[in-house]
Every structure is written in structure tokens, then in C-alpha cells.
Design a protein with these regions (language model features):
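Sec-dependent signal peptide recognition
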Residues: 2-9
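PRPP-associated nucleotide enzymes
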Residues: 9-230
Length: 230
């Protein structure tokens, strides 16, 4: 069994954990949040809020993997203490529209981080994404965290990764609510140094490239149905 460099935060991957103990961290709070976003009865407000919390909690996990520095501080008691702090803020990037709630959660962990946005629309016949908007800051030599709700076929996130890689970042980390095995393999085949943090993994992609059991279209569930054409 291939040892994925993936941090999967759900007990579903027990078989993976035996081969690679470092990739499995059981988090009941994430399981509860994934249950909420899977539930078809969850309204838009609570769906967005759950995704926001998933983004925040996954980013706290990412924080443990980032470079740190030790900073000394003198307290009001005229005594000094030393604490480990993140060496520098990463650049946060998300894919519109579905990734916006997760980005909001990520910004709670890194409120001063630079942020970038990518607009993509998937062709439902070819399953390929057309890039409609690129608005990202300079990421040269920096750690970049890319968030999207779903890692399904991996097409959209792979396109996002390739855009970021043109600037030679120091590190790329993916944060997803739900990831499919096929998408994970595709990303790591492209770049095995990428780390993937996911709250859940699903085993199946249907004929339309949607994750099963999945949760539906994250953008539509967050903000309502969009018109296919104007």
C-alpha cells in the first residue's frame, strides 16, 4: 500500500494508519462537522459555518507542520518567558465559490496573512476546469496553503497548484473538507512533496466526477444555485 503524504483527520483510514502512523489523527469535532455538511437538511448559513470551522481546525493542524521561531517576552510580572511562534504567515489561496467559507476559517488562524483567489468553472462533460480569474500575491519562497472544499478528480486543485508553482513557493499545502483517493493520487503523482490535510476521505467518484457519498455542490449549498449562462 502506498504511503500517502496526507494528513487525514478521520478514523475512517485506519488501514492507512498502520502503514503510515503519521497520517492519521482522529478528531471527533471534524467528524461532527463533516456529518453536518453531508446532511441535505443543513441550511446555507449552517453549511457555511461548518465549512468555516473545518477550515479553521484543519489550519490549526497545518500550523503544527510550519517552521517556528522562539520569541522571548517580558510579562507584567517582570519575568521573561519564551514561546514558539510561527516563523512567518503563509499565503492563503482558495478557489471560488466553494472554498470561501474555508478561507474565512483559515484567516482566523492567520488574520494578517496575504490571500489569493482563483476562479474556475468545471465543464460537466469533460470534467476539466476553465480558469476565469487569477488574483494571487507573490508567493516566491513562501509557504502556500490552498483550500477547496472537495478534492475529487483533482483537476481544479492541480490547475491551482500549477499556477502557484510558477512562482517557486517554498511549500504547498492543500486543505480540503473531503478528499477522494483518486484525487489524492493525482496530486501526489504530480508533486509528492505536497501535503494534504482533509477532514474525511471518500472512496468513489461517480461518472460525473463527483465524490460519493460526498455532500453535493459546495458552492451551491453555500450560496444558492447559480445560472449556467447569463
Amino acid at each position: 500500500m502506498r504511503c500517502f503524504k496526507v494528513c487525514l483527520l478521520l478514523v475512517l483510514l485506519l488501514s492507512f494508519s498502520k502503514a503510515c502512523p503519521e497520517i492519521l489523527k482522529d478528531r471527533l469535532v471534524l467528524s461532527q462537522l463533516v456529518h453536518e455538511i453531508r446532511d441535505p437538511s443543513t441550511d446555507k448559513k449552517h453549511f457555511r459555518k461548518a465549512l468555516e470551522k473545518i477550515g479553521e481546525y484543519l489550519t490549526l493542524e497545518v500550523l503544527q507542520d510550519l517552521n517556528t521561531k522562539h520569541v522571548e517576552i517580558e510579562t507584567l510580572m517582570r519575568s521573561k518567558a519564551v514561546h514558539a511562534l510561527c516563523d512567518e504567515d503563509p499565503v492563503l489561496i482558495t478557489i471560488l465559490r466553494g472554498g470561501i467559507p474555508m478561507m474565512i476559517g483559515m484567516q482566523k488562524v492567520f488574520p494578517n496573512a496575504e490571500a489569493g483567489f482563483l476562479g474556475m468553472a468545471r465543464n460537466e462533460e469533460t470534467l476539466k476546469a476553465a480558469i476565469s480569474y487569477i488574483g494571487i500575491p507573490n508567493v516566491h519562497g513562501k509557504c502556500v496553503i490552498i483550500a477547496d472544499t472537495m478534492l475529487a478528480t483533482g483537476g481544479s486543485l492541480l490547475d491551482a497548484i500549477k499556477i502557484v508553482e510558477k512562482q517557486n513557493p517554498k511549500q504547498i499545502i492543500l486543505v480540503c473538507a473531503i478528499a477522494a483517493k483518486k484525487g489524492i493520487e493525482r496530486i501526489l503523482d504530480h508533486n509528492p512533496n505536497i501535503k494534504i490535510f482533509a477532514a474525511a476521505t471518500d472512496p468513489i467518484l461517480n461518472e460525473k466526477g463527483y465524490i460519493v457519498p460526498g455532500l453535493g455542490d459546495a458552492g451551491d449549498r453555500s450560496y444558492g444555485m447559480k445560472l449556467e449562462t447569463l
